Amino acid sequence: QDKPFWDPPIYPV
């Protein structure tokens, strides 16, 4: 759990 994840699986890479 390092990346902020919302309802849609969106990961700022």
From Swiss-Prot:
Entry's Gene Ontology cellular component terms: extracellular region
Residues that bear Pyrrolidone carboxylic acid: 1
Biological process according to GO: defense response
Subcellular localization, as worded in the UniProt entry: Secreted
Keyword Secreted belongs to the record: yes
Keyword set, alphabetical order: Amphibian defense peptide, Pyrrolidone carboxylic acid, Secreted
Tissue: Expressed by the skin glands.
Keyword Secreted: yes
InterPro entries in UniProt: Tryptophillin
Family as reported in the entry's similarity comment: Belongs to the frog skin active peptide (FSAP) family. Tryptophillin subfamily.
Protein name as it appears in the record: Tryptophyllin-T3-3
